From Swiss-Prot:
Oligomerizes as a right-handed, spiral filament on DNA at oriC. About 20 DnaA protein molecules bind to oriC. Forms the RIDA (regulatory inactivation of DnaA) complex with ATP-DnaA, ADP-Hda and the DNA-loaded sliding beta clamp (dnaN). Interacts with DiaA; this stimulates the association of DnaA with the origin of replication. The keyword Coiled coil does not apply. Residues 309-399 are annotated as: Inserts into membranes. At least 4 systems specifically target DnaA to prevent more than 1 round of replication initiation per cell cycle. 1: SeqA binds to and sequesters hemimethylated oriC, preventing DnaA binding. 2: ATP-DnaA binds to the chromosomal datA locus, hydrolyzing ATP-DnaA in the presence of IHF. 3: ATP-DnaA binds to its own promoter, repressing transcription. 4: RIDA (regulatory inactivation of DnaA) via Hda and the DNA-loaded beta clamp (dnaN) hydrolyzes ATP-DnaA to ADP-DnaA. This is Chromosomal replication initiator protein DnaA. The keyword Protein biosynthesis does not apply. It is a peripheral membrane protein. It catalyses: ATP + H2O = ADP + phosphate + H(+). Belongs to the DnaA family.
Amino acid sequence: MSLSLWQQCLARLQDELPATEFSMWIRPLQAELSDNTLALYAPNRFVLDWVRDKYLNNINGLLTSFCGADAPQLRFEVGTKPVTQTPQAAVTSNVAAPAQVAQTQPQRAAPSTRSGWDNVPAPAEPTYRSNVNVKHTFDNFVEGKSNQLARAAARQVADNPGGAYNPLFLYGGTGLGKTHLLHAVGNGIMARKPNAKVVYMHSERFVQDMVKALQNNAIEEFKRYYRSVDALLIDDIQFFANKERSQEEFFHTFNALLEGNQQIILTSDRYPKEINGVEDRLKSRFGWGLTVAIEPPELETRVAILMKKADENDIRLPGEVAFFIAKRLRSNVRELEGALNRVIANANFTGRAITIDFVREALRDLLALQEKLVTIDNIQKTVAEYYKIKVADLLSKRRSRSVARPRQMAMALAKELTNHSLPEIGDAFGGRDHTTVLHACRKIEQLREESHDIKEDFSNLIRTLSS
């Protein structure tokens, strides 16, 4: 049986699975074929359990299709292949990751002799600053479809820092949970290795520290400090834009950390290649590991966030009230939590029960602003401008894809962002019936799962209309 069997499986899995799934779960696996048993080695227990739960049938099916009755048995283990293998016998999953999800690293200098996470030394400097907020953990991060992959990737990094996903780059709009995940990773690493040097900071703090070091003729101390950490977590990396000296220093810090198997996690409000004012060599490096988007939370996740927040405050929030708020406030988690805090404060001050009518009163200015900002007319104008067509095209009977797809997108956005019924939405789109609107909504939902471009279009339009 050929040792190229796993490579054949990888090629098929890469074709069959969404790009993000393949990059996150399949690519890190290593394989060893021996005595009619194919052993798959996962970097940690989390990956092992996920692969066995989600992809066991896929892999077994491929083995059977390639080998028939002679298909090897599968065995899963945590760790790496035995080092006694010859290079020719090693079978690893070095299939190039799709560019829009993650890019494998170009050849770099050989890593230092530092072995990484089995021998983390005690902190050397008493002035070392972690800045990790202990309140932000994976346990109190509300997971939904919009952030599931980002949370899973962050969890893997916390369990195996300096491993497969280095750097990890999280991007998305304001208030979607990027900072929460940074702190959760920091807490996860320090729970596993209490002596680990984990530093969280905003990108502007890095710039300020560098300026002070230059002013005090202490740039070497600055370099030693940042290059000695075990994990560097930097928020809002887009603020490095047009700061040439800071980018130069971070470039060398980035290289030093990766060569030492030290973890880097970065966040931004946009995809790495879309960050203006940042050098191409840095943007390229941002994509060396894994890049994951965090989307605005869908309705069910917004409701879960409100219910969890209310529970943390010992407040009984009726389900219908949570749905009422979640249906009307859609842009980000911070806005949701702020609205709920306002409702709770009003209830405490007045002693009234939290009902839908009470929420309407407590949030009347906020709800009025939302309804004013997001109308079907506004959605139609925004979608037409985005796709470079005319609003009249959206209302017409034209069925060409260049018009039909934007029309479906606009209908789906109208259902998501307004409180209009399906018949009302249909009337606003040239007198179409409610079944046409329903079909459009289902079609866009399907395409968001299948097409990276449609998913990005939907997220961009939601962000524009909700801001």
